[in-house]
């Protein structure tokens, strides 16, 4: 036993020495290269490798932590995402204090690329909500604990934010069930970037059809109210969509119809948009929004079991919609999968032909030929991604209790 421990110590010491020698050779080799050449090399490396290089040289750290470099690195990652799309799967581990796992999936190879597990100082309690990605950064929110975190899975950095004024007010109020029904917020916060990063929280303040909006200022580390607010109550059970500097929400039903509320994140002014006239449903829980190619899209999610799913896109003029995809939901055959989740538990999940007749959320367009869909298993056991091309399913990735977001990695977080 002692001999084995000594051998392990020798092997560990040898490996450490080898790494130091490799880094030393790298430092010597790179010192003979012009700074701009070294920077170009860094731009082609993944974030994980760059984080290691930061500790090897003060000059390298200065380069890698500069806003100029991080923005160039992000643009390259965004261009790469077009040809080599990736998504982030966010899952929660069921403990008294929930751990949250971020896993990157390649949609080309249908494989996991990297993962990061966060155990926050103040644990979350179910349910938790994750925002869409903004430069590879996410906002994680727990209504029960009132905790809000901004998280960068690539660098494993996170920052806790102070509670919104709405949260403080509700905590002091100790509301009744009727009060909660009137003041129920949109659970999903919107995390966007104008000149600086912004966190936007829209909620219904009372029964008199008044809506309030709070914006978190990262520089001031404080929440503030927007004075120009929509005169419509917002449908609470939705995830806001973001495209071209605008955020979108559904209103509650008015006179048997719903509308789309839009917020310009630069001017912080709201405007009202119509929904596609050919989408028959007037119930906001029966339709959904998504972003495809940086444009707002809409589709029906409920109603009679439909074989065909239609996806509509808002035109740039914002006065009309156009149908861009018609998807046959029965293009997939019976299948089963072995699922490896973020905690090394293997499960067996089955989908039948009946399960497939459920509207799916478009995630991305892959090389202009395939549309990538996130499909919720009808028994609510999880989600899967499916890639459709000309009514032919190519691949599936089932993921238990997952939020699925597009992903680009941001190296630094100085702006927030």
Swiss-Prot record:
Residues 27-76 form the F-box domain. InterPro entries: F-box-assoc_dom_typ1, F-box-assoc_interact_dom, F-box-like_dom_sf, F-box_dom, Gal_Oxase/kelch_b-propeller, Kelch-typ_b-propeller, SCF_F-box_component. GO terms for cellular component: plant-type vacuole. It comes from the Eukaryota. Kelch repeats lie at residues 199-243, 297-341. Keywords: Kelch repeat, Repeat. SMART domains: FBOX. Disulfide bonds: none annotated. NCBIfam families: F_box_assoc_1 (TIGR01640). This is Putative F-box/kelch-repeat protein At1g12870. It comes from Arabidopsis thaliana.
């Amino acid at each position: 036993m002692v001999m084995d421990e000594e051998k392990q110590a020798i092997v560990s010491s040898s490996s450490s020495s080898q790494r130091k020698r490799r880094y030393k050779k790298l430092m010597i080799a790179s010192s003979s290269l012009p700074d701009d050449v070294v920077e170009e090399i860094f731009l082609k490396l993944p974030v994980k490798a760059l984080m290691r290089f930061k500790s090897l040289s003060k000059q390298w750290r200065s380069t890698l932590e500069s806003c100029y470099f991080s923005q160039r690195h992000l643009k390259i990652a965004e261009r790469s995402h077009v040809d080599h799309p990736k998504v982030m799967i966010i899952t929660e581990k069921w403990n008294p204090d929930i751990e949250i796992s971020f896993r990157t999936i390649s949609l080309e190879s249908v494989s996991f690329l990297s993962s990061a597990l966060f155990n926050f100082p103040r644990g979350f309690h179910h349910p938790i909500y994750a925002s869409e990605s903004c430069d590879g950064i996410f906002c994680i929110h727990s209504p029960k604990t009132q905790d809000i975190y901004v998280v960068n899975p690539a660098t494993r950095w996170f920052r806790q934010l102070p509670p919104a004024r709405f949260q403080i007010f509700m905590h002091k109020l100790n509301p009744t069930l009727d009060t909660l029904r009137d003041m129920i917020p949109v659970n999903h916060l919107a995390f966007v970037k104008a000149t600086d990063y912004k966190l936007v929280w829209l909620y219904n303040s009372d029964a008199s059809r008044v809506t309030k909006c709070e914006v978190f200022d990262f520089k001031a580390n404080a929440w503030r109210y927007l004075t120009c607010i929509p005169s419509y109550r917002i449908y609470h059970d939705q995830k806001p969509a973001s495209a071209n500097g605008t955020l979108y929400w559904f209103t509650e039903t008015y006179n048997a119809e719903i509308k789309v509320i839009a917020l310009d994140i630069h001017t912080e002014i709201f405007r009202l948009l119509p929904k596609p006239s050919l989408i028959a449903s007037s119930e906001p829980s029966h339709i959904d929004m998504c972003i495809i190619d940086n444009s707002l899209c809409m589709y029906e999610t409920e109603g009679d079991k439909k074989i065909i799913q239609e996806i509509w896109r808002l035109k740039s003029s914002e006065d009309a919609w156009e149908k861009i995809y018609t998807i046959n939901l029965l293009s997939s055959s019976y299948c089963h999968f072995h699922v490896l989740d973020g905690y090394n538990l293997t499960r067996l999940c089955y989908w039948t032909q009946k399960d497939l007749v459920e509207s799916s959320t478009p995630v991305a367009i892959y090389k202009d030929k395939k549309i990538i869909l996130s499909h919720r298993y009808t028994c609510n056991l999880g989600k899967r991604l499916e890639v459709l091309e000309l009514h032919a399913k190519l691949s599936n990735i089932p993921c238990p209790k997952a939020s699925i977001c597009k992903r680009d990695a941001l190296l630094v977080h100085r702006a927030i």
